[in-house]
């Protein structure tokens, strides 16, 4: 800069300080889902797992970086839940916050450091955003989520009670009727439309951006899932991504979604994304 003084690199949008290892290759992950699916809870648990079991498994050093306000909130929520306290409140919708609040919204940023086996260190920055489920209930609101167009990958969190095949079970368990109105298929359709427009992908091609589909609250269905199912077995503790294990879980989740009247969502995934699990 012209002042020739010390400077700090920050994101031009949310003003989160960038670590020295941040580059254009550092992935930004968007976390989206229907209202009440548990996105903030998942992010709270993910933040803890990254800095404990995951870094041990991969012999890595993983730590929060930049502005840690959201990371601190996630840690407080996780601690409160562990003590049997309250769950985090619903994330405020995009349209219900001021422009200043939108512009200052911060991701949870983690730096993953790993030895590459040649006496050198590799570092990757992961950023996670939390989005209110109501923001994805209509295409008009979804278009306002400009950051989704900049993500390198998207995590879609689904509430199993949102599938029509589980509505009766949801009511028997006292699930709020209002949470059954937003269909998972509608949220996925809006995401597909946004990403197609952002990437200028025509109807004859598939979206190349990876999509991870996560089903929350799966423990509510353990009575109907065998104990030896891949969905209930502990995951691998080997220091690498287990492709066979991932594919096995993928196939079992797909079968569950089909049983829950989610066949339309599965076909939408297959027809619109080249990479998804």
Show the residue positions of the predicted features.
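Conserved C-terminal guanine-recognition region of P-loop GTPase G domains, centered on the G4
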Residues: 117-120, 144-245, 250-272
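Short linear interaction motifs
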Residues: 11-13, 21-28, 104-107, 132, ...
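Conserved G1/Walker A P-loop phosphate-binding module
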Residues: 1-102, 115-126
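Short, well-ordered amphipathic alpha-helices
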Residues: 14-15, 46, 110-113, 188-199
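Extended hydrophobic secondary-structure segments that form protein cores and membrane-embedded regions
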Residues: 29-33, 126-130, 210-217, 275-276
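Switch II (G3) loop of P-loop NTPases
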Residues: 122-142
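Short, flexible loop/turn elements at secondary-structure junctions
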Residues: 35, 114-116, 128, 132-135, ...
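Catalytic micro-motifs at enzyme active sites that drive phosphoryl/nucleotidyl and oxygen chemistry
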Residues: 17-19, 94-101, 110-118, 139-145, ...
